[in-house]
Amino acid sequence: IATARSTTGEYTFAIFAVVTLALLISWVIAVGATPFIGTWLLKERAGGHHEVFDSRFYRALRAAIEWCMRHRWLTILATVAAFALGVVGMGATEKQFFPNSDRAEILVEMWLPEGASYQATEREAKRLEAIVAKDPDVASFVGYVGNGSPRYYLSLDQQLFRPNFAQFVILTKDVPGRDRAVVRLRRILDEQFAGIRARAFRTPLGPPVAYPVQFRVMGPDPGALKRLGDQVAEVVRRNPHTLDTHADWGERSPAVRIEIDQDRARAIGLSSAQVARAVGAAISGATIGTLRERDKLIDVVLRAPPTERAGLGQIAGLQIQTALGRSVPLSQVATIGEVMEEPILWRRSRTPTLTVRADTVDGVQAPDVAMQIDPKLAAIRASLPPDYRIEVGGPWEENAKAQRSIAAGAPMMVAAVLALLMVQLQRFSLTAMVLLTAPLGLIGVAGALLLFRQPFGFVAMLGAIALGGMIMRNTVILVDQIRQDLDAGTPAWEAVRESAVRRFRPIVLTAAAAVLAMIPLSRDVLWGPMA
């Protein structure tokens, strides 16, 4: 985690810091304070202490270990079978990147059609504001028109400044109230804001992701991308677990196209830049100065009145000032026409990219939904022209990035672990045996996740890695005890059996301590799967 160069590594770096600090402190206590406390509490007795490992429990444990050793092939077969079941069980677990948070907050986003004015967006935002203010589960809320909320917590997906966009951050009285309010808001948005693309959702955790299900269609021609995007959207829409499937380009909208006749423009001393500035100033306005009002500076904008820019005829009659001081109508140097075009074109690595996005219904995991949809896009992928491709985005892609960032630092960490094991064990065979025990943690991981119906996400993956380290630590303790007994002249069979008996209590106690430490985290939405 410490070497991961990704937003996920940044988000979860605290795990590395806390675990490292805890292990260092526990090591200091183990080699310093624990022996001192032991010599202080465990006084010598006349006649000596009784044999600790000769109780009824230890006799039964010794017999069980003896049986496993005598039937070693059966024991190995059972272990391999349990491991295979664990691998199969991992395939049956729900997949997750990061869960929704347990904050009593709801985010509402509203998109009017591209080209809608700030005033139109504000009117719709005020309509929703009046509805939210009457909701019995809402404690407070704030709305933003033209842009999104400031990034008040790390997982918030930032929005661009757009006049057709509005966002609400709604704080409810409690988490159950949040769940009730989000259902009501979704119904209200569907029924009363039918002409607007709107969504209400719980605040997420993890690196910012715009939508839980995303598929990117990439290629050179925007028209072909639009057609392919419609096909992909239809496949996504057919999945019963998706909501509000749409493309980020929006619907085609009318636009005015002005084509300048370069010969005529040059003949009267006009350039394309001069025409563009004049038309832009008349239609959109141009800042010609500032006005100071107390501690604020207000722009003074010069713009043609609405009657001179309301239609194609008025735009064609706009007067353009030439270098000679004469004014000519725009229609004299340009052809003005109305066309339908894409309101916004997104690019990724300079390639036109259309993203099909969708929300998911409650109770399902976004990576599972994406995994259900992706194979059904095989027919579309097979028919793609050259230079076109379809990629998976959203949490699935972010999860893959996070795993790659961790895998990039894995060789260095594996080398460090191998070096430490070789220093401790002094033999390749013992080191290999210790390493082979680490994957056995999947047996418990799969069983626990399926039993408690927890998803396997990024944090759970970190927990599985930590569990593998704990298993190797216990194996090192046992192997070291066996080696000490062998060096003392104990027969190999007896050394293995008695070492397992003697190290049983400390290994179980350390495991039990770890389990008890995880209990407070077991109900947390983020750390619960790891616990």
Regions found by a protein language model. Name each.
Residues 226, 233-413, 419-425, 431, ...:
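Extracytoplasmic/periplasmic membrane-proximal domains and adjacent transmembrane bundles
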Residues 119-208, 263-285:
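Solvent-exposed, membrane-proximal periplasmic/extracellular interface segments of envelope transport
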Residues 86-88, 104-114, 155-174, 204-223, ...:
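Short, hydrophobic beta-strand segments
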